[in-house]
Amino acid sequence: MTGYSSAVGSFACDAGTLQKLMAGRTLACPCCDGPLTAEKLSRLLSDVQRLTALANDRPDHASTGVGRHAAMIIDPHAHMISRTTDDYEAMAKAGVVAVIEPAFWLGQPRTSVGSYVDYFAMISGFERFRAGQFGIRHYCTIGLNPKEANNEALAEAVIDALPRFLVKEGVVAMGELGYDEQTSLEDKALRKQIELAKEYLLPIMIHTPHRDKRAGTLRTMDVLKEHKFDPARCVIDHNNEETIREVLNRGYWCAFSIYPQTKMGSERMAALVESFGPDRLIVDSACDWGVSDPLAVAKTARLMAQRGVGADAIHQVIYTNALAVYGLNGEMDEQHWLAPAAIDQRTLYEGNSVLRGGQTPRIEQPGRPADDLRIV
């Protein structure tokens, strides 16, 4: 390598030099587990150098799609109640500054409205506290998921309980709403909740069904149109190649969950950004209790950079677009992480700590260290 200094990303290396260094070695790419060739590594090092130069040229780090913000990530769909604090620590190191946790099905149907009330209290209360103790801002969406809408008595009781949570701090939308099996009871619950979102001036996060996805997505958008809900205030999530064009054509935000076994993979996501551009596209992990990855957004961003997707486009799909739509009701604000509160793990939530016996509390004052630049 030539021109190396201690500054992050301050190096240059040509493909020929890398060929010599890597001769006879087989390396795996940390982003996609594919072969790491000299050409691919050279491109990655070049991207790092370019992004670092852009950051150094903008000391105020204004939100322009370059500099430090190019390395910041919002994961706008992460079921953190199902994850450990190790995941929060790993996400923070990867550049995640904020997560949005949608209310969802826990893997087993709830049998009483009290279970739902406790769950809503958890994701709007303790989970928000827990994330903050590890340097990540936490927001949530509140709603009755379609899978449990088929228990009519439970669904009606839950919908009656929603208003008390829709006004809580950190609630940025209603969701996940939509269809699972596309039954009449799911339709009834969806329509009631759309009207609640209009009443409380909240955006909506839509869950599209795993089965018969295209038909369910089109039906959902038809219902939203019937209720005169503004597409610019609605995120249609779990999209794929079958649904993207129609969702974009109708003016909705189009989100993709990097959940390779059932939803979307990183390579496919990169190809969609290349084909359709970044406008109104959002990348999330949908990490939960299943086989999923809380670092999926960061890994996808790296893969897109390796494939030559521009820094501005990457910034849009992993940060700017999510902030634009989920910041509409004012609960999510970029200043929450640009001027963060102190981290003090001595703090308790209703008498409880995030630590266990023998652990040393982490205490940090506002502001990020000077060497905090993260290249995605």
Residue ranges and their predicted role:
Residues T84-D86, S184, R214-M221, I244-R250, ...:
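Histidine/acidic-residue-rich catalytic or RNA/ligand-binding cores of hydrolases
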Residues A38-S42:
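Short Cys/His-rich "knuckle" micro-motifs
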Residues G95-V97, G170, E199-L201, K225-P231, ...:
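Glycine-enriched alpha-helix->loop->beta-strand junction motifs that scaffold or abut catalytic
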Residues L27:
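Cys/His-enriched microdomains
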Residues F276-P294, I314:
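Short acidic/histidine-rich active-site segments
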Residues G34:
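Short Cys/His-rich local motifs and their 1-3 flanking residues in nucleic-acid-associated proteins
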